[in-house]
Amino acid sequence: MTPKWSTIGSHSSYELTRCIVCGGADTLEVAGPSDIREEAEALWGFHMRRLSPHTPPERLVDRVAFSQAPPWRVVRCRDCGLVYRNPMEKREELCATYTSETPERDALLALHRAQTRTYRAQARRLVRRLERRGTGLEVGSYVGAFLAAARRERWHFEGLDVNPHTNAFARSLGFTVHDADLEHFEPSHPFDVVAIWNTFDQLPDPRAAVRAAHRLLRPDGVLAVRVPNGECYARLRAVSVTSAERMSVSRAVLAHNNLLTFPYRFGFSPASLTRLLRDLGFDVMGVIPDVLVPTADEWTRRWAVVEERLVKPLTKRWTPWFEIYARRRPAAA
């Protein structure tokens, strides 16, 4: 199989946008169309070397094929450092993309089992941060993996997702999941925690999402977010052009962490996300550096499974992903 990069973005509508953290329009280009095309080809080669030639096309999802097309251009805000697509896909097309996906039940069940193991560590970290248990809402609950992990830690979490197909699957496993987006969700009670894992960077309007989370939380509630680090992407791209050796290392770090081709709308850094949260009524409790969850499966070559176990933890020095925990600031008297 070979990738058809000539069709990138050909069926999408775009619009120019400003930085959603500071509102600025003064940016530096991080990657242009030719850069993204080169990265896409490098990403394809990276995974084709590590996967069996018999890998089903559907198992390439979130490796070389993503819900959104690769960006035309990636920029970095000169003021706050946010990395983002500009131009960006229009909101209505983004929503249609995520609501229309209908994976097979076997694929959803395999994802649920694999992701539940990964999410156990996040559920335990959440317990340590809050030093108590209570109620929570996971935004972008997808196959219900975190809901299962949270239940094991004796938390009562509900799910929220825009995709009715995956929501029906999660409900079939015994979880409470709502068909809605965060901005328009009207629950009957407030939550102790709102968790947004691996979804915040894909939302149409992260600023509006933070406001909504603030509205849904108790006065001392906590917002927990996990995102890819846009600063890491920009920094390693800049380093990669200085020599062939550095390009090889940089692309390997980015590929191991799903940052190559920047398959996200927004790439926050700890500093830019802290600024956004503080502006919207939260006090940051802490930031935890992280890496992409393991992706090796039964289609991964044996040497590549070992490589991922050994190499991926070493990439944490670049903080390719991070979690941030923030407490809802009490309203002024």
Predicted regions and their residues:
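A short His-aromatic
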Residues: 198-202
